[in-house]
Amino acid sequence: MINNVGIDIVENKRIKLKEEFIVKVLSANEIKTFNIKNKKQKREFLAGRWAIKEAIIKTLDQPISMNKIDIEYINDKPVIKNQELQNILISISHEKKYAVGIALKQCDNK
């Protein structure tokens, strides 16, 4: 059962490739992936992470820093690596100008 939904969309050109913004949004693992991309890919990657992390935060009862949320792809699907956020399903989508993220928080059923 879905407990909460978060969604966010961002225009890629609004994303700035500045170090202080990058470390605010990306986890240490994500920064490694980010660093091997070209400039266009970096902007799209960062926009996607911004959108999905905003969506995740919207589902939570307590605030969390974006860079504490660690996302990676497993079998071509985005997955939250944080144990405490395992009950949140996510999807990231990219279009020429935009990135969108949606997060579905599932009930614990306890």
UniProtKB/Swiss-Prot annotation:
Its cofactor is Mg(2+). One of its GO terms (cellular component) is cytoplasm. Its main location: cytoplasm. It catalyses: apo-[ACP] + CoA = holo-[ACP] + adenosine 3',5'-bisphosphate + H(+). GO terms for molecular function: holo-[acyl-carrier-protein] synthase activity; magnesium ion binding. It comes from the Bacteria. Keywords: Cytoplasm, Fatty acid biosynthesis, Fatty acid metabolism, Lipid biosynthesis, Lipid metabolism, Magnesium, Metal-binding, Transferase. Pfam families: ACPS. It is found in: Cytoplasm. It is an enzyme of class 2 (transferase). Mg(2+) binds at D8, E54. GO terms for biological process: fatty acid biosynthetic process. Its EC number is 2.7.8.7. Belongs to the P-Pant transferase superfamily. AcpS family. Transfers the 4'-phosphopantetheine moiety from coenzyme A to a Ser of acyl-carrier-protein. This is Holo-[acyl-carrier-protein] synthase. It comes from Mycoplasma capricolum subsp. capricolum (strain California kid / ATCC 27343 / NCTC 10154). The lineage of its organism: Bacteria, Bacillati, Mycoplasmatota, Mollicutes, Mycoplasmataceae.
